[in-house]
């Protein structure tokens, strides 16, 4: 089950998460929760061992809207190369704080520029505070670079590949038709 909850709620109220998590305590269902935040205190306050995923931990957008961060410009969008949502300093700072707190980190990176940024940030965090069983990962990895793959291999960073949602009924695809 892959779910995203709490999006749009003020005060970070994760209602769906609370319901699923409470039910899992009584039925043996294993739940792995990644608070969708770059605020390490969100995970620590809830005593959760992980942080990240998409939304606030997304480093770029997606191909359909041309905001996946690319090293080369999109050929069909007047030379745009997508968007990195954060500068390296912010991502590295987040990764160092989360890693030092003992949290498992997941970040969303679709484009190759975002993938490289995630790799550099996780490498910096692990150089700063080495951990053997960190289980950090970069979600999507649609265009991984050789340099980034080498960092992932050398630092044991997971690459949970997730393909685009082109034919997924829940994905609003009206923008693809324009």
Predicted regions and their residues:
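Beta-strand segments within the central parallel beta-sheet cores of soluble alpha/beta enzyme folds
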Residues: 131-141
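Short, contiguous strand/loop micro-motifs
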Residues: 80-82, 134-136, 174-176
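A general structural motif
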Residues: 85-87, 140, 178
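Short helix-capping segments at alpha-helix termini
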Residues: 24-29, 125-133
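Active-site-adjacent C-terminal substructures of enzyme catalytic domains
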Residues: 143-178
């Amino acid at each position: 089950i892959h779910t995203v909850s709490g999006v749009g709620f003020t005060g970070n109220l994760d209602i769906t998460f609370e319901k699923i998590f409470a039910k899992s305590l009584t039925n043996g269902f294993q739940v792995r929760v990644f608070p969708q935040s770059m605020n390490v205190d969100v995970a620590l306050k809830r005593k959760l061992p992980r942080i990240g995923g998409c939304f606030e931990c997304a480093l770029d957008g997606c191909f359909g809207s041309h905001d996946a961060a690319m090293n080369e410009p999109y050929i069909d969008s007047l030379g745009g190369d997508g968007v990195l949502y954060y500068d390296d300093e912010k991502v590295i700072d987040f990764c160092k704080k989360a890693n030092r707190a003992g949290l498992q980190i997941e970040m969303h990176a679709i484009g190759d520029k975002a993938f490289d940024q995630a790799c550099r940030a996780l490498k910096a965090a692990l150089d700063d505070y080495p951990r053997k069983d960190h289980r950090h990962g970069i979600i999507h990895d649609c265009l991984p670079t050789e340099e980034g793959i080498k960092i992932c291999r050398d630092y044991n960073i997971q690459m949970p590949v997730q393909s685009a949602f082109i034919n997924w009924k829940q994905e609003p695809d009206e923008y693809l038709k324009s």
